[in-house]
Amino acid sequence: QTLSNGIEVVAAQTGDVPIATMTVLVPGGASTDSREKAGVAQFAAQLADQGTADMSAQEIAARLESLGASLSANAGRDGTFFSLTAPVANFEAAGEVLSGIVRSAQYPQAELDRERKRAIDGLLVEMKDPGELAGKVASLVMYGDAPYGSQSGGTSESLAAITREDLIEHRQTWWHPSETKIIVSGGIAPAQATGLAQSLFGDWTVGAPAPTPPADPAGDAQPVRTVVIDMPEAGQAAVYAAVRAIPRDDERYYALELANAVLGGGSSGRLFEEIRTKRSLSYGAYSGFADRADDAVLAASAQTKNETADEVAQIFLDEFARLGTEPLDEALLDRRRLYLGGSYARRLESSSGFNSIVAGLMQQGLEPAEAARYADRLGQVTPRQAGAAAQELVDPDKATIVIVGHAAEFIDDLRAIRPDVEVIPAEGLDLSSADFGLEG
């Protein structure tokens, strides 16, 4: 159902326990951040409950607590989610708090300064953690200067530059009723849920037209690179191998989902089997790709001793090749379908899980009903289709490798695999551009 101001509402009764969840999905994810102000979308979401036109942060917290309600907010790449869970009897009262937050978050300076310090302190820790840093570098290398390549959590420099006015401007620009979607589920009748959405958000209007999201947030596919971030003090190395993948609405999505489950889904994936079970090179090795409105990245990752980083990178490349060349058999795919379908079904059982799945689908341009088709879609994928998706997309020759660790312990062996290695010091690393600030 669509409200008069353009808000799309999806309501489903997913249980009998009288607790419900309302998720409000607005545009303006991290892909709308400029590099100079990376982190604006995340700050705008996280700090939205720190004061509105009518309530202080303390009043908001006390009100939600008195109603038995919990509120979370997060900015993904493609949009921002607010999720409110409360007893049905208190749902309207809690929803009034949420409505005030979405419409009129004020971002008090003191709260911004406190969150900024906490976030910058956290980033300093992450920049010394090989696993955290490798993930940031891989994202930047895979997307270059395209919107998806922006650091969603910001950099120390960008967080220092964010002002209160930036956050208010972000809210006023991107949180727009005509582009907003509301999902309500749990122990609440759909008619009651839709009525609540109408009473809470139906009169929300904004004078300015709806903003236009970035047209091509993933940008062009980037050159294949082998990047080593040298961290001499690292006790171990983090290894990533990443390839360009597909948007959520691509017809090959379910084939790639199944192929990836064979490769690196959980402890029965091939990467775990080869790297952990057979060779004890790591405590775990996995692969995955996010659901995105534009091209995602499929990445394999593991942490290992510095001296075996090159060996893990080679296993990643070998397993990428094997996935696309060695035929997949139906029995193997059946086991993977069971694994994927089971975890998906468990997520759908809770109102928060249901809402997050449906909100994601809507954000990625698919209809909410797709949530109920997941197991069927996986069941329709043939071994040949899964193999073809792997061959086309999970190609070792197209894989960018990122290793963060003590380079001296693996660099010579890595050059035997990939001669064209870029070695960049971790100290003072600039994550605002794909050349790490080294050019120009």
What are these regions (language model features)?
Residues Q106-Y107, E111-L112, I162-R164:
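Peptidyl-prolyl cis-trans isomerase
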Residues R171:
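Conserved, carboxylate-rich catalytic/transport cores that coordinate ions
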Residues V10-A12, D16-D49, M55-S104, R116-L124, ...:
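M16 family metallopeptidases and their MPP-like homologs
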Residues G144, Y148, S152, H176, ...:
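An aromatic/glycine/proline-enriched structural segment found at the starts
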Residues T2-L3:
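A general beta-strand register signal
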